[in-house]
From Swiss-Prot:
One of its GO terms (molecular function) is structural constituent of ribosome. Keywords: Ribonucleoprotein, Ribosomal protein. NCBIfam families: PRK00595.1, rpmG_bact. Signal peptide: none annotated. InterPro entries: Ribosomal_bL33, Ribosomal_bL33_CS, Ribosomal_bL33_sf, Ribosomal_zn-bd. Gene3D superfamilies: Ribosomal protein L33. GO terms for cellular component: cytosolic large ribosomal subunit. This is Large ribosomal subunit protein bL33.
Amino acid sequence: MAKGKRDKIRMVSSAATGHFYTTDKNKKNTPGKMEMMKYDPVVRKHVMYKEGKIK
């Protein structure tokens, strides 16, 4: 079976709450690390989420 073009990634909160979102990204179009502002329900604010590996 062929390997897919998208990798599953984990978006980890920079607020150090341990909260994360899972998503996927296209390896070819976005080779660098993703960063985006998302809502962290633990601190009840929008914070920066950075890409991490799924274990």
